[in-house]
Amino acid sequence: MANTFKNIKKKLRRKRLLAEKRHLEKAQAGAGGNEAARRKIKAALRRKKAVLKPVAVILIAVFVVLAGFLFLEKRTYRNYKVQVTSEQEDTVSTQYTYLSGKILRYSSDEVSLVNNKLETVWSQTYDMQNPVADVCGDCAVIADKDGTSMVFLDKNGITGTVSTSYSIVKAKVSKTGMAAAILDGGDHTWINFYNLDGSLVAENQTNIQDPGYPMDVALADNGVVMMVAYQFVDSSETTSYIAFYNFGEVGQNEDDRIVSGYTYDGVVVPQIQYLGSNAVALRDDGFTIYSGRQIPKELKTVQVEQEIISTFYDENNIGLVFKNDSKDKQYTMQVYSSAGKLKFSKYFNIPYTTIRMSDDYIVMYNSSQLCVLNINGSEKYFGSVDGTVKDFFKLGWNKYLLVMDTGVNVIKLS
């Protein structure tokens, strides 16, 4: 009997030990699974961090850039530092303009390209009496106003020359280097169209009665479409006619290659210009915008009641200035987009003699004062200078060319 109880106890002990062993093995197996799961979670987190880290770095960098841009846009300056100066310049007979990130310097006998350190990149000679330049992108034309000579050039130098049969009234150039000139032939005027090398593409004789006297000419970026503003008198009323010529395939079957034209009774259009893909006719009562690469159409007309005393523009903006009767608010400036939408209107009191768009900024000056506004109309700089200001325009980030009667300076606002 005793042996029987012993055997039963042994069996029970063995079952208990086996149960504990199975429980332990099960627990160990569960612990191993949890460990594997933990390893998977950690690996996923590491992968997520690897993805998020560069994204976070990029977002921080973008934020810093935007913050810096906003700071610089809102920052105003009250002084400037002269970085480079040249007192050997003949600023009386020499003129300056911006070309391809550098300075185009020209006079009656020479044209040269100068960098921002006032070092000459190249220089070439010609012979003119009254040189006037027009620049578009990397191309320029210099014409002898009331003379018969023109030179075509790009950032590398002169690409062609022309000797015209009649006196040059005005010359314009496109981004592709195509150029147009209005020539005065006495009873008739001519509008000639040239390649970058100076070769004649087309010539068009006009009559003062039909379509009128050409006031201005402008060229599209594609180098194919030419815009001309004519003026004539109809029944004692001054009338303007805007014509678009197409020298490509689209215009070959049209009379005189005119693909579209618009007449404005009682309106004077002294100035026209291409603004990127759009064109604008600056009128004495506002402006009209045209759109269309091959056959331009009227897009929008903005009319104003006040007398316009100044206009300025670039590819994205059109600016008008009006004179007010108030001593506290002498002038009103309105700036529109190239689609004709008003961006801002503001009063100002600076007695300027020149106002222009320069590298996305509005600059104005008189003989002793300079002023710079950003494209939102906020004043960036206003100050007086010693000496007589001859010219002033933007060269790049916070740098300007200041032409004085005593010499030429590259300045930085501070």
Name these PLM-found stretches.
Residues M1-G32:
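N-terminal targeting leaders characterized by basic, low-complexity, disordered sequences
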Residues K53-L70:
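Hydrophobic membrane-insertion alpha-helices, especially the h-region
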Residues R75-T94, N115, E119-M128, I158-T164, ...:
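Aromatic (tryptophan-biased) beta-strands that constitute blades/sheets of beta-rich domains
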Residues Q88-Y98, D127-D138, Y166-G177, Q209-L219, ...:
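Repeated scaffold domains used in trafficking and secretory/extracellular systems
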Residues E110-S112, T148-F152, D187-F193, D234-N246, ...:
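Structural motif
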Residues N115-K117, D154-G157, Y194-S199, F247-V250, ...:
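Short loop/turn segments that connect beta-strands within beta-propeller blades
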Residues V121-K175, L299-V302, I309-V335:
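Structured, soluble extracytoplasmic/luminal domains of envelope-associated proteins
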Residues T189-L282:
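Solenoidal tandem-repeat scaffolds enriched in leucines and small polar residues
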